[in-house]
Amino acid sequence: MTRLIIPSLLFLIVSCSGSKEKPLLPEEVSPDVYRVLLDNDDVKVLEVTFEPGQSDNMHDHYPVTFYLLQGGKAQVTLPDGTVNEREIPTGFTGHNTEKVRHQVKNIGENTIKIILVEHKNTHPASESGGTLILPEEVSPDVYQVILENDDVKVLDVTFAPGQGDNMHEHGVITYYGIKGGKLQNTLPDGTVKEMEVPDGFVGHGNTIVKHQMENVGEDTVKVIIVEHKKLMPVKE
């Protein structure tokens, strides 16, 4: 996976805007490009699809974490008329802490597809939630950290058929299933639940969860998890 480490590429994808006016929501000004998958008080998850030659309209984003499901060549125009072009690879992952305004066009020959997790509530955590059993530490063969900063941690999760992880914990997370399948979820009290999850499944958890997962199907399951470091879990 490609991490967001190049300043010029950060400027391309997430260019800052100091505007105080009413935000131009991408799903409202360009509904043919942006589809809302999930929206609550904390986050908004958007599926973004640019066909070759397709453009959106000038719009704003909350602070955002993004993952390129399908990369390509994009042109980004800023409110001041500045234009940038860049080849963005599949798997490219990034995060911006500021609100942004820009317009994007696919100037390549293939479809570009992006998952955006916009952070609507970014207040600092006011109290410690304690030390969690981190999945990437107890099951590094399943969980790979592809981006981490003070705000978020992004995990690439891959379960081969028959593969399971070890008991672990999550804080506040948002997740998107790149490739679904049949999973078995085991809780600390021994409760077991099987579930069929489709490609593109999306969700958000605001409590601390402790569990163990196993792929009991015949296909590889792949998930992207965004852990929110600045959101306190709700106490059950």
In which residue ranges do the predicted regions lie?
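C-terminal motif of bacterial Sec signal peptides marking the signal peptidase cleavage site
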Residues: 12-15
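Bacterial signal peptide processing site
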Residues: 17-19
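A short glycine-rich, His/Asp/Glu-containing loop-to-beta-strand
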Residues: 30-55, 66, 136-164, 175, ...
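Short acidic-glycine-tyrosine-enriched beta hairpin
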Residues: 39, 80-98, 189-207
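Histidine-centered metal-chelating micro-motifs
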Residues: 53-56, 82, 94-105, 162-165, ...
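Glycine- and acidic-residue-biased ligand/ion/polar-headgroup-sensing regions
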Residues: 61-79, 170-189
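Ligand-binding loop in jelly-roll beta-barrel domains
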Residues: 71, 99-120, 207-231
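Surface-exposed beta-loop interaction hotspot
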Residues: 118-140
